[in-house]
């Protein structure tokens, strides 16, 4: 069942990526800029959301609460 779910989600992402790239080349630079700004943003303050890839300012993420520690 897990394998089927992963395959389904992968197919959805591929379909979404394909349809969003059709006929929208003029917005390509804008999407690239948005992605770069997300990659270069600062750390997440205490109490902010964190997950598998935590970027907490305190370098500590409470995984059970999904928030950055103080």
Swiss-Prot record:
Tissues of expression: Expressed by the venom duct.
Disulfide bonds: 43-57, 50-61, 56-68
Gene Ontology terms, MF aspect: ion channel inhibitor activity; toxin activity
Any one GO CC term of the record: extracellular region
Compartment(s) where it occurs, according to its Swiss-Prot or TrEMBL record: Secreted
Keyword Signal found: yes
Leader peptide range in chain numbering: 1-17
UniProt keyword Signal, yes or no: yes
Prosegment residue ranges: 18-41
Keywords from the named record: Disulfide bond, Knottin, Secreted, Signal, Toxin
Region (Disordered): 19-41
Pfam families associated with the record: Conotoxin (PF02950)
Similarity comment: family membership: Belongs to the conotoxin O1 superfamily.
UniProt comment concerning the protein's domains: The presence of a 'disulfide through disulfide knot' structurally defines this protein as a knottin. The cysteine framework is VI/VII (C-C-CC-C-C).
Name assigned to this protein: Conotoxin AbVIC
